[in-house]
Amino acid sequence: MSKGSTTKKWIQDHTSDYYVLQANKLGYRSRASFKIIEIQDKYNLFKQNMFIIDLGAAPGGWSEQVVKFIGNNGKLIALDLLEMAPIAGVEFIQGNFSSDETYERLNQLINDKKIDCVISDMAPNLSGNKTSDQARSIHLLELALDFATTNLNRNGSFVAKVFQGQGSDEYLKLVRESFNKVTQFKPKSSRPKSREFYVVATGFKG
């Protein structure tokens, strides 16, 4: 199949996707909103007054839901390389999470406070080389985990998108070293053919 045909098929599948249609109907920013809603329904991670960091936030599908869960007295900082339209109650940083400059801006907003939950829907820009793309994905996951274990409250939580493949099992072992309970969850709103799942880690050992 040619690249043009592949792109055309993706557009057709995307525009007829149930969750895309529902997101449009409900005014959600993306189908990803349903994923974080499913995660909350199953694990009840987000509570009033919590401090949350959302990595890989654009276009804001997770942030627009989580900010409702934590209420007006909660705090949510979102970060992404891409622009994101403002969301009431969300502080946004545009920058590359792997850069020292962006990391420093994030730390300034955190202001030495401990975080209740770090959520990450980060994924690399795909090159088409599966081996390279998977390695870059695992690298982002390692950065997110390092950030979480540095900044979380004791008993805090961590949620991140993982693509099944080389390095994913080893990554889960790393997560288990720092959290009391680690589970894998594939939301119904994930595309069936996608290799993605979410690692949900609770009870940060501190």
UniProtKB/Swiss-Prot annotation:
EC number: 2.1.1.166
Active-site feature positions: K161
Keyword S-adenosyl-L-methionine tagged: yes
Gene Ontology CC annotations of this record: cytoplasm
Family annotation (PANTHER family): RIBOSOMAL RNA METHYLTRANSFERASE, RRNA METHYLTRANSFERASE 2, MITOCHONDRIAL
Originating species: Francisella philomiragia subsp. philomiragia (strain ATCC 25017 / CCUG 19701 / FSC 153 / O#319-036)
Record localization: Cytoplasm
Chief place of localization: cytoplasm
Catalysed reactions, as listed in the record: uridine(2552) in 23S rRNA + S-adenosyl-L-methionine = 2'-O-methyluridine(2552) in 23S rRNA + S-adenosyl-L-homocysteine + H(+)
Family: Belongs to the class I-like SAM-binding methyltransferase superfamily. RNA methyltransferase RlmE family.
InterPro entries: RNA_methyltr_RlmE (IPR050082), RNA_MeTrfase_FtsJ_dom (IPR002877), rRNA-MeTfrase_E (IPR015507), SAM-dependent_MTases_sf (IPR029063)
Highest taxon of the lineage: Bacteria
Protein name, UniProt field: Ribosomal RNA large subunit methyltransferase E
One Pfam entry name: FtsJ
Top enzyme class: transferase
Function in brief: Specifically methylates the uridine in position 2552 of 23S rRNA at the 2'-O position of the ribose in the fully assembled 50S ribosomal subunit.
One GO MF term attached to the UniProt entry: rRNA (uridine-2'-O-)-methyltransferase activity
Keyword terms, alphabetized: Cytoplasm, Methyltransferase, rRNA processing, S-adenosyl-L-methionine, Transferase
Residues that, per the record, bind S-adenosyl-L-methionine: G60, W62, D80, N96, D121
